[in-house]
From Swiss-Prot:
Molecular function terms, GO-annotated: rRNA binding; structural constituent of ribosome; tRNA binding
Classification via InterPro entries: Ribosomal_uS7 (IPR000235), Ribosomal_uS7_bac/org-type (IPR005717), Ribosomal_uS7_CS (IPR020606), Ribosomal_uS7_dom (IPR023798), Ribosomal_uS7_dom_sf (IPR036823)
PROSITE patterns: RIBOSOMAL_S7
Function: One of the primary rRNA binding proteins, it binds directly to 16S rRNA where it nucleates assembly of the head domain of the 30S subunit. Is located at the subunit interface close to the decoding center, probably blocks exit of the E-site tRNA.
Family annotation (NCBIfam families): rpsG_bact
Signal peptide coordinates: none
UniProt protein name: Small ribosomal subunit protein uS7
Regions that span the bilayer: none
Protein family according to the UniProt entry: Belongs to the universal ribosomal protein uS7 family.
Organism: Rhodococcus opacus (strain B4)
UniProt entry keywords in alphabetical sequence: Ribonucleoprotein, Ribosomal protein, RNA-binding, rRNA-binding, tRNA-binding
Name of the gene this protein is made from: rpsG
Length: 156
């Protein structure tokens, strides 16, 4: 195991179009096979579709969607004796943002619309309105944590 401690976080460069590190993170989550320009095109077009449908700044829509998807609690496996318990723990802010973006992208890819632009735009709009599969994942995560609250004293 490394002895130097955790690797330092690398600074996120602000997105050139919207000037937001969240958009940069979203582009990096969409990225497949190193095709960054394709990922950027998908994200920018999806944000434009969101702007047309809502009439508001797409970064505000993205932030609202993330706030509705970010989990506050999650469960972690902890082995005590011969049993494995699902122990509820609070989610660190950076991890909650990362999870929210990951869920948005994952559930966008599973949607039925024709293009990825439409899928991402509609998942963002659904999430900003408190609907959609990503918001359901957050609810399920919170339910799991609530159901296993009895094991909270095993926290580390």
């Amino acid at each position: 195991m490394p002895r130097k401690g955790p690797a330092p976080k690398r600074p996120l460069i602000n997105d050139p179009v919207y000037g937001s590190p969240l958009v940069t993170q979203l582009v990096n989550k969409i990225l497949l096979d190193g095709k960054k320009s394709t990922a950027e095109r998908i994200v920018y077009e999806a944000l434009e579709v969101a702007r047309e449908k809502t009439g508001t700044d797409p970064v505000v829509t993205l932030k609202r969607a993330l706030d509705n998807v970010k989990p506050a609690l999650e469960v972690r496996s902890r082995r005590v004796g011969g049993a494995t318990y699902q122990v509820p723990v609070e989610v660190r802010p950076g991890r909650s943002t990362t999870l929210a973006l990951r869920w948005l992208v994952t559930f966008s890819r599973q949607r039925r619309e024709k293009t990825m632009v439409e899928r991402l735009a509609n998942e963002l709009l659904d999430a900003s309105n408190g609907l959609g599969a990503a918001v359901k994942r957050r609810e399920d995560t919170h339910k799991m944590a609530e159901a296993n609250k009895a094991f909270a004293h095993y926290r580390w």
